[in-house]
Design a protein with these regions (language model features):
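Bacterial N-terminal signal peptides that target proteins for export
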Residues: 1-13
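Pocket-lining segment of extracytoplasmic ligand-binding domains
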Residues: 102-103, 181-276
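Short, glycine-/small- and polar/acidic-enriched structural segments
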Residues: 33-178, 183-188, 192-196
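Bacterial signal peptide processing site
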Residues: 27-30
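Secondary-structure end/capping motifs
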Residues: 239-320
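C-terminal motif of bacterial Sec signal peptides marking the signal peptidase cleavage site
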Residues: 21-25
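Conserved C-terminal helix/tail region of periplasmic/extracytoplasmic solute-binding proteins
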Residues: 310-348
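Small-molecule pocket liners
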Residues: 57, 122-128, 226-230, 234-235, ...
Length: 348
């Protein structure tokens, strides 16, 4: 699936970026002065973590419905090209991007200039998966001595060890790094378990007639996490609070629409990515699953983050020595988790 597709809207945004840069070249970092001088929309760059999928639906819904335009913003989507969105945002090459709580925590602990501004999914959306006919595997505790098909995520092996240990096992298994080939390796029996995204690869497996048995991390006492986040460049956020608020609120509206009408949102996602996403039934099923089970918190709200949620997974990452400084040395004490996220841009 590592194909890169640039929609017509993305190409158009690139042209707008060039024009906006020309018009506002004398405006500097003062967004109010720039707007009054040129009346041009502000360009905001958003980095994707993968080819477009239902994790990104709210972005495309907001584009399609003109929510960003209402906020005076032109969005330039930076397609996935093997560059980590966190790296692009930290370097100022994108204002916002998709991220994940574990990797975002590790990046910010080491000094990355990031802040999480919105939680797309409130809970883990990946689960441990084995073939359904593996009668010898009834819980993650049974994975000791087996082979894990991994993805080269810096936290994944210790996370799997933590899940196995939480279930009563030792966490002693072999990891082979396969990337997206891990799914085929599981289906063919070349690895014993992997971690599909249940609202995507889980549905794909079902459509292919592959029966899986899955185990949710939190069912065994492992801490929960925000599976998908939107992070912003912290310096840019502080320098451009009005644009940041306009962008985040427009984006949140798109995701909220995706919860309220998953089928319509899935159709928009497909329309905005012509030729790339061809299976509408799968898109609708995936979007419905996310809307029902993952995108809203216990109060029925979208996007909100809490310090407790950050600190619970953070404690595991700290104890596992996955949080290091910019020299790679494990931190001596936990970070101030409240500094890693903000809800302020969701509020008027």
């Amino acid at each position: 699936m590592k194909t890169t597709s640039i929609s017509l809207r993305t190409i158009a945004a690139a042209g707008v970026l060039a024009l906006t840069t020309l018009l506002t070249s004398c405006a500097g970092g003062d967004e109010a002065e720039g707007a009054s001088a040129s009346n041009a929309k502000t360009t905001v760059r958003f980095a994707l973590d993968w080819t477009p999928n239902t994790n990104h639906t709210g972005l495309y819904v907001a584009l399609n419905k003109g929510y960003f335009e209402e906020a005076g913003i032109d969005v330039e989507i930076l397609p996935f090209n093997n560059s980590n969105p966190e790296v692009l945002v930290d370097a100022g090459q994108a204002e916002f991007g998709i991220s994940f709580q574990d990797t975002a925590s590790m990046s910010m602990a080491s000094g990355a200039d990031l802040k999480s501004v919105l939680a797309v999914e409130q809970t883990w959306a990946t689960e441990v998966a084995v073939l359904a006919d593996r009668d010898d595997i009834e819980s993650p505790a049974d994975l000791d001595g087996l082979t894990f098909g991994g993805f080269d995520n810096p936290a994944e092996t210790k996370t799997m060890q933590g899940v196995v240990q939480s279930a009563g096992g030792e966490g002693d298994f072999e990891t082979v790094t396969l990337g997206t080939s891990a799914y085929e390796a599981l289906y063919s029996g070349d690895v014993d378990f992997t971690v599909p995204y249940v609202a995507w690869e889980g549905i794909e497996a079902e459509h292919r007639g592959v029966d899986l048995k899955t185990f949710a991390y939190t069912d065994y006492g492992f801490p929960d996490a925000y599976q998908v986040l939107v992070v912003g460049n912290n310096t840019w956020l502080e320098d451009n609070p009005d644009t940041a608020r306009g962008f985040v609120q427009a984006l949140a509206r798109g995701y909220e629409d995706s919860v309220e009408d998953p089928e319509a949102a899935a159709k928009i996602l497909q329309e905005e990515n012509v030729g790339l996403l061809t299976d509408l039934d799968m898109l609708v099923e995936s979007q419905q699953m996310l809307a029902d089970d993952y995108m809203l918190d216990d109060n029925g709200d979208f996007g909100i983050q809490t310090e407790q949620h950050w600190s619970e997974l953070g404690q595991f990452l700290f104890d596992s020595e996955l949080l290091t400084d910019n020299n790679g040395k494990p931190l001596d004490e936990q970070p101030e988790w409240s500094e890693f996220f903000t809800n302020e841009y969701l509020q008027d």
